[in-house]
């Protein structure tokens, strides 16, 4: 369940926010609890009945399209505010068959937006146990190393204000669930994640894409 990890993350984030706002924990709970929750969600924490409502996340106001999708694994799921799914269900993920050349999903805005950060949450097989154990019985079915669902190679490109497509990110050998890419601010009309390969599965799986213009 990783309850110690989840609790530690929540306490540490709350302490940092108290320091940032120069308030006591009781004041944080009374006046800033929603901000704390949203910050935890942004860092891939999961809170029951709380979804992404981050006003700074520009992906939330974008339209979403994709090269293809599996039944029930709609492209719009990547901005529904949730990054967990019940096993075998696709209520909060975009999914598409892994093919030669990969699959893409794209965010588009009505007009150009200024971006300098893109955050992606991939599927890392949270439904499957991954524990440290000296027991052969417990370890027998545990998959070590990069999880099979994980997108391995991917690219990010965008259409700029002139209508030209530009390359932005090219990643090989990814094994991380949460990826943040930061770059010099750019004007963007649309942003495309092109998932090329996975580590083992036959489906491309993405939970969420967020887009930000960082505040100095």
Locate the predicted segments by residue.
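Predominantly extracellular/luminal regions of secreted and cell-surface proteins
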Residues: 54-84
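Aromatic, loop-rich ligand-recognition surfaces of beta-strand-rich domains
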Residues: 85-167, 173-216
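Glycine-rich phosphate/pyrophosphate-binding beta-alpha loops
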Residues: 1-3
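Internal hydrophobic alpha-helix adjacent to the cofactor/substrate pocket in enzyme cavities
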Residues: 6-23
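Short clusters of small/polar residues that mark proteolytic maturation junctions
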Residues: 15, 169-170
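Non-catalytic terminal regions with compositionally biased, polar/charged low complexity
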Residues: 19-54
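Extracellular/surface-associated beta-sandwich interaction domains
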Residues: 33, 50, 56-62, 87-88, ...
């Amino acid at each position: 369940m990783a309850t110690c990890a989840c609790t530690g993350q929540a306490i540490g984030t709350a302490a940092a926010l108290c320091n940032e706002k120069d308030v006591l924990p009781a004041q944080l709970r009374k006046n800033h609890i929603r901000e704390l929750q949203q910050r935890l969600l942004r860092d891939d924490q999961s809170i029951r009945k709380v979804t992404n409502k981050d006003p700074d996340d520009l992906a939330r106001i974008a339209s979403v399209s994709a090269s293809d999708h599996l039944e029930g694994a709609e492209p719009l799921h990547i901005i529904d505010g949730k990054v967990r799914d019940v096993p075998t269900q696709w209520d909060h993920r975009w999914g598409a068959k892994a093919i030669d050349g990969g699959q893409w999903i794209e965010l588009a805005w009505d007009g150009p937006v200024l971006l300098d950060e893109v955050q992606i949450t991939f599927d890392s097989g949270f439904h499957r146990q991954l524990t440290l154990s000296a027991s052969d019985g417990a370890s027998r079915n545990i998959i070590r190393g990069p999880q099979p669902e994980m997108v391995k190679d991917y690219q990010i490109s965008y259409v700029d204000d002139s209508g030209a497509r530009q390359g932005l990110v090219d990643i090989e050998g990814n094994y991380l669930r949460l990826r943040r890419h930061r770059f010099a601010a750019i004007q963007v009309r649309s942003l495309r994640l092109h998932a090329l390969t996975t580590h083992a599965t036959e489906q491309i799986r993405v939970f969420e894409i967020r887009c930000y213009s960082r505040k100095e």
